[in-house]
Amino acid sequence: DPELKSLIQNTNYCIVDSKHKISLLEDYAEKKLPIVDITPFDTRADFGISQQLTVQNILVPIDTIEQSKFEELIVLFASYFETNETARVHFFTRNANWDRVDSVLNFTREVLKVNGLDERLARKETNDKAEFDLDEEKKVPIKFFVDQCVDELSISKCIREQRIMVDVTARPDLYLQISCISSAIPQIVSFNTQYVHDAKNGFIVKEVSEVLNGLKYYLDNITNWNKCMIYSYELGKEYNTASLIRKWKGVMKQVEQD
């Protein structure tokens, strides 16, 4: 769009929500620009309740995930369950469709079946007591869940119960990344942003297969998880309300001078 390009080229100031977008915008405008990155979300120290739970919840955003990566993740998690009985996967979706939960679980079961794995790991939760009277069912606890979160309140409640986030989508969810910093939980991501520092508050992976090492590093070793919690707490200070206000004041002052 020539009009948009001209507008950006002649602007006095640009605001982006993360540092990685600075180079993208300058490449588009074909010139250096007066840009500052300010996250649209602030951090609020809220360490959640994951340490109080008897299970280790793994949050996995899926709304923009490639199907091949989704399939690979499902198989990887099923394999990880064999060595970590307390691990539980929570597929995260903002999709409010009435059949979203069923469609995700159906897909998960199909992938498990095709790969010779127990599809009961992804059966739907039910209040029907008759199901649990069966000895066989008791031996196979549900390990795949779908968290359908359509507002900030439900997302916040969901994050508080997670032990780690695994996001291998091509577009990072900044709200989730900031929320993970607030809750001080590790993040395994495939997209490099300033909110995840490799080997500090998470890992940046190139291949889905690398996720397994990250899970073992943080979920099988409480010391590593605690180090991440401390680092996340310090990192969160860079994006708290006071820090964002200072940045905005700096922008306003610069604009007034121009």
Regions found by a protein language model. Name each.
Residues N12, K157-P172, I185:
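Acidic donor-binding loop of glycosyltransferase active sites
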Residues D102-V150:
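Nucleotide-activated donor-binding/catalytic signature segment of Leloir-type glycosyltransferases, i.e.
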Residues I15, Q51-K69, I74-A78, V89-F92:
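Conserved donor-binding/catalytic core segment of Leloir-type glycosyltransferases
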Residues T241-D258:
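C-terminal alpha-helical cap of glycosyltransferases
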